[in-house]
């Protein structure tokens, strides 16, 4: 049994960083979008700041602690079980966030329902044409001047054939302010999730893959997870 779905309809947690000069450094736009999404979810502001800094410290390759961050001294110390080193790489799965102390203070359903871990360190990018009413928080997080009601209105009025460019999109909602976005709006899917389940008598196995589709019409697998093989 196989399924394929748009892989961009989520907040890529790895977008909190960009890669520059051999290190992962903060991405201010994505941090702003992350903060707004959690604010809309009524998460305490201290937890928002702590979780953002601690996630970035987990990913980056240096040992310099951010204002609200944590580095290896904490993860290898007696207060952390099991003792481990920070990842120093992009996250493979959002489940890795469970190692982050500040994240454990936030309702896990928020991450499970809205976030993903794509192996991409760049601004958030979502396909507006594949969003549904479960994605209002995601859409509102990208635009500083769009609230949840605005986001729901936009999604409810996506035309059957979709939008094909930003001018077409923005002209449809002239009363809304799309200035200074903290992410990118796409009009075609470039990232896909595939899941394959195999059943044979008492045997069961599955695989999940992330496939990226480039402008040259070539696709390639950027991540794959197996279970039961």
What feature does the model see in each segment?
Residues 1-229:
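Compositionally biased linear targeting/interaction segments
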